Every structure is written in C-alpha cells, then in structure tokens.
Regions:
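Conserved catalytic core of nucleotide polymerization and phosphodiester-bond processing enzymes
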Residues: 1-278
Length: 278
C-alpha cells in the first residue's frame, strides 16, 4: 500500500504506438483550462521532493521535418525559431517579427492540421475562416513547404502499394482501406497513413528515452522516480538533493534518444505540484 493514486499504461492501446492510460486516465487531464489546472494542482510531490516535467518541443513537427526533408521546415528547427511564427512568416509573406497572434494561431492550425490530414472544412471550423479561405491557406502552405506535400503524397502512394505504413524503427500499421472504393473509408485510411509514421515515431522516441533514463537512474542508484508519461512529456518525482543531477540527465538523454536530421528539443519545468510547474 503506497497511499498514492496509480494509473495503468497499455503498450498496445492505440493504433500509432502511443501509450494509453486508464484506471484512471491521467493523460487526459486538461492543461489549458482552469478546471484542468486545479485538478493538476492536487498532484503533489512527496516531502523533500519536487516534480520535474520534461516535454519534447514540437516533436511531431520535427519528425515531419526529418521525413519530408523540406528545407524551410528543417531550417526553422535548425535555427531554433518558433515554428508557428516561422510558418506565419512564410504563409503571410511578412518578416517573422511582424507576425501577430492571429497569424500565428492560423499557422499553428495549419502545422498540426497537416499531420492529421485536416481538410479545408476542418481548417475553417478551427479558425473561423471560410472553407474557401481554408483551402487557400492550405494551398499556400504547401507552396511554401513543397517538401511536405511531396512526402505526404509519397506516403499515400507507398501505402497503396504495400498496404501498410511504418515508423522510423519499422513498426507497421496495416491499412487495407487505403484502396477502398468507399470515399469515406479511403479518406480515413489516407489520414491514418499520414499520421501514423509521424505520431508513431514520436512514440518510439519517448519510449527509448524512458528506457535510457531509467537505466541511468538504476546505474547511479538514484532515488528519483519516473511517475507519469503524458505522450510527449515525462514527469518525475525527484528528491531536492537530486534535482540538478536529474535535470542534467534528462537534458542529455531525451534529445539524444534517436538521431534525426533536425535537433530534438526538451523543455524542463519543476515545482511542488503538477499544476504550477515553472
């Protein structure tokens, strides 16, 4: 008996390879709502310890840059630019320092929409643009990032030929509906074909990081514990005497868990409760 709340993780709970959490699901507690933050504040570290959260920054877009080898996308990450501002600059044809919050918000929808196969209707629904404007922005996006368009078309073609897509480490997802005559089934399979290699590779990366970090903790006989995984984020309970060492370990092992053609970046926060990490 630990007098603590324990979740369960499933390795095969999702089609892309992401871990899923249940009983209770601690991966779905909102972070951007007031209620979600208040719930997170209930999760506290033990006496003499702190919580340390390490979050991969834009990992799925970095994986997309690696796969697509689009020069503009790769350059933005190599220069450590804010990727949504960089996309705004290209799409709106303005200097990056002239990008405003509305421009960045639309660029963010476009960037993540590409990964999930978002349609002009989906863009319009998330941005309050018209469908015609949504389509226009998608066309401009692919005009500025032609490598992404080429990569996505190639993924769908390869999936039709082989019947599956795979992550960077070769983990496959078979999609028999990719050649379905039914438009809805075929479109759904095409979106899955686009998303799985990206999200699945991101899942591979964080799982490798988890193994490497735990091995290091064991080797050093440290008392720090990995207590949560929330997709792109790892959360540890760390004795205050180990905080500096733990931050160094995470900063070393998470960005180096798998070699990509763009750098991986990790943001680290710490604090007493999960809702107030800085």
């Amino acid at each position: 008996i630990t007098n603590r709340l324990h979740t369960s993780y499933r390795q095969t709970g999702t089609a892309t390879g992401r871990l899923s959490s249940n009983d209770p699901n601690l991966q779905n507690i909102p972070v951007r709502t007031d209620l979600g933050r208040r719930v997170r504040e209930a999760f506290i570290s033990g006496k003499g310890s702190s919580l340390l959260a390490a979050d991969y920054s834009q990992i799925e877009l970095r994986v997309l840059a690696h796969f697509s080898r689009d020069p503009a996308l790769m350059k933005a990450f190599e220069n450590e630019e804010d990727i949504h501002s960089a996309t705004s600059s290209l799409v709106y044809d303005v200097p990056i320092n002239k990008v405003n919050s509305d421009m960045r918000r639309i660029a963010k929808v476009l960037n993540f929409g590409v990964i999930y196969g978002l349609s002009p209707h989906g863009i319009a629904r998330q941005t309050n643009l018209s469908q015609s404007d949504g389509k226009k922005f998608i066309n401009i996006y692919f005009d500025k990032y032609p490598g992404i368009q080429k990569y996505l078309d190639g993924v769908k073609t390869q999936c039709r030929e082989k019947g599956y897509v795979e992550t960077i480490l070769g983990r496959r997802r078979y999609l028999p509906d990719i050649s379905a005559k039914n438009f809805r089934l075929r479109s759904q399979a095409e979106r899955a074909a686009i998303n799985m290699p990206i999200q699945g590779t991101a899942a591979d990366i964080i799982k490798i990081a988890m193994i490497n970090i735990q091995n290091r903790l064991n080797d050093l006989n440290m008392k720090s514990m990995m207590i949560l995984q929330v997709h792109d984020e790892l959360i540890f309970e760390v004795p205050n005497t180990e905080l500096s060492q733990m931050e160094s370990i995470v900063s070393e092992l998470m960005p180096s868990s798998l070699k990509l053609d763009v750098p991986l970046s990790v943001e680290i926060k710490r604090g007493y409760n999960w809702g107030n990490l800085t």
